[in-house]
């Protein structure tokens, strides 16, 4: 007896979800003006404008100019799934021992696959290699999933360390060296 169409569709989507979980996410340093990096930032800005109750205007946000996102001043990373950009993140030098993580974003189609966590871990590794001992980041109150991930990854909420107009939560993490992890 053949499965009903609804059951067959559910089974297909379940298999599709399982297969998509096994694809490899690659996170690599990129230049901030590459086509993939620009696409990710455009999607990031679009999503923030849709999700924030006040909207989002990048001109009003604290800047992260391209020249601050290339070594040794910073890093721009792009996450790719099957060769297609699905996420990004930025590490920006604040001072010789402190870095700031910005522009953490994952495409909705790639969420729940560990993309953001892999981007965050890559940025933390780059921070350690750059000699940073502390990382800062901030986020908006509507991004509850980001707040949960940061807390799970050892970031603690601290007092505001900048005047980012869209931020409601500021986080900090003290990094351990690779040898003591």
What are these regions (language model features)?
Residues 9-14, 18-21, 32, 40, ...:
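C-terminal "cap" of GNAT-fold acetyltransferases
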Residues 35, 113, 144:
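Loop/helix-junction capping segments adjacent to catalytic residues or to phosphate/diphosphate-binding pockets
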Residues 120, 126-139:
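Conserved GNAT acetyl-CoA-binding A-motif
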Residues 97, 113, 129-133:
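Short coil/turn segments at alpha/beta junctions that flank glycine-rich nucleotide-binding fingerprints
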Residues 106, 112-125, 148-152:
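Conserved acetyl-CoA-binding loop-helix of GNAT-fold acetyltransferases
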Residues 22-102, 107, 120-121, 126, ...:
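Acetyl-CoA-dependent GNAT
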Residues 83, 87, 114-116, 131, ...:
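Conserved phosphate-binding and hydrolysis motifs of nucleotide-dependent enzymes
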């Amino acid at each position: 007896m053949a499965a009903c169409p609804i059951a067959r569709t559910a089974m297909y989507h379940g298999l599709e979800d399982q297969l998509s979980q096994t694809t490899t996410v690659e996170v690599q340093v990129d230049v901030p003006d590459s086509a993939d990096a620009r696409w990710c930032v455009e999607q990031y800005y679009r999503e923030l404008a849709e999700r924030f109750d006040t909207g989002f205007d990048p001109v009003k946000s604290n800047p992260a100019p391209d020249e601050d996102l290339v070594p040794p001043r910073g890093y721009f990373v792009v996450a790719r799934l099957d060769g297609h950009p699905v996420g990004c993140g930025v590490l920006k030098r604040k001072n010789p021992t402190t870095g700031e993580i910005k522009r953490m974003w994952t495409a909705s189609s790639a969420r729940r696959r560990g993309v953001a966590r892999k981007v965050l871990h890559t940025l933390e590794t780059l921070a350690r290699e750059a000699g940073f001992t502390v990382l800062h980041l901030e986020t908006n109150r509507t991004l509850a999933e980001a707040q949960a991930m940061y807390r799970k990854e050892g970031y603690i909420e601290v007092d505001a360390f900048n005047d980012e107009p869209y931020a409601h939560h500021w986080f900090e993490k003290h990094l351990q060296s690779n040898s003591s992890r």
